[in-house]
Amino acid sequence: MPPRPRFDRRAPVRELPNINERIKYPKLRVVDADGTQLGIISREEALDVAQDRELDLVLVSEKADPPVCRIMNYGKFKFEQEKKAKEAKKKSHQTEVKEVKMRYKIDEHDYQVRIGQATRFLKAGDKVKCTVIFRGREIQHTNLAESLLARMAKDLEEPAEVQQAPKREGRNMIMFLTPRKTPLIKKEQELEEASKAKRTI
């Protein structure tokens, strides 16, 4: 019976950056760390210059003839690139309005489920529309719906702030929450400092 083929459990090989000794081109156009053009020099000379600066020789344009390298701190460069990529990804996120629906007579378990949903939406950077739905004569209990939404705003005060207070909209009571820009602790400290300043005057 032929042996069973073995599964290759090794992690996929990551592509290593073209820096220092990994650069194999004999001639390179080199730019110094301060932007000065060092011209076309040999690979060995470029590596010596980078080593003297205690920096890295990084291949920045492989398609050029000869390839272009820059002398830089590669660790710092990589960190800045990753930081820019994260910021770009954050800016590219388009804010959506997610809706959380409930009845004013909602039980505690279902209420906590709605709180969890709203928290996830807010942490993803989206606004949340909290809607209490009335059926038939339930419309008489708008005060209970308003109290429920006020409780929700309080329970979500850490990740959110109220953009629009509870109000009637047709047969529903709605409230809009938006992700909090100022951390709650910082905001409380600012209010406390403002209160102290008033007492001092």
Curated annotation (Swiss-Prot):
The Gene Ontology biological process terms listed for this entry are: ribosome disassembly
Q: Which UniProt keywords apply?
A: Cytoplasm, Initiation factor, Protein biosynthesis
Instruction: Look up keyword Coiled coil and say if it applies.
Output: no
Q: Where in the cell is it found?
A: Cytoplasm
Q: Name one Pfam family in it.
A: IF3_N
Q: Which GO terms describe its molecular function?
A: ribosome binding; translation initiation factor activity
Q: Which InterPro entries match?
A: T_IF-3_C_sf (IPR036788), T_IF-3_N_sf (IPR036787), Translation_initiation_fac3_CS (IPR019813), Translation_initiation_fac_3 (IPR001288), Translation_initiation_fac_3_C (IPR019815), Translation_initiation_fac_3_N (IPR019814)
Q: Which GO terms describe its cellular component?
A: cytosol; membrane
Q: Outline the subunit composition.
A: Monomer.
The UniProt entry's sequence similarity note says: Belongs to the IF-3 family.
> Which NCBIfam families does the entry mention?
infC
Function recorded in the entry: IF-3 binds to the 30S ribosomal subunit and shifts the equilibrium between 70S ribosomes and their 50S and 30S subunits in favor of the free subunits, thus enhancing the availability of 30S subunits on which protein synthesis initiation begins.
**Full protein name:** Translation initiation factor IF-3
Please give the organism.
Prochlorococcus marinus (strain SARG / CCMP1375 / SS120)
Phylogenetic lineage:
Bacteria, Bacillati, Cyanobacteriota, Cyanophyceae, Synechococcales
- Gene name? infC
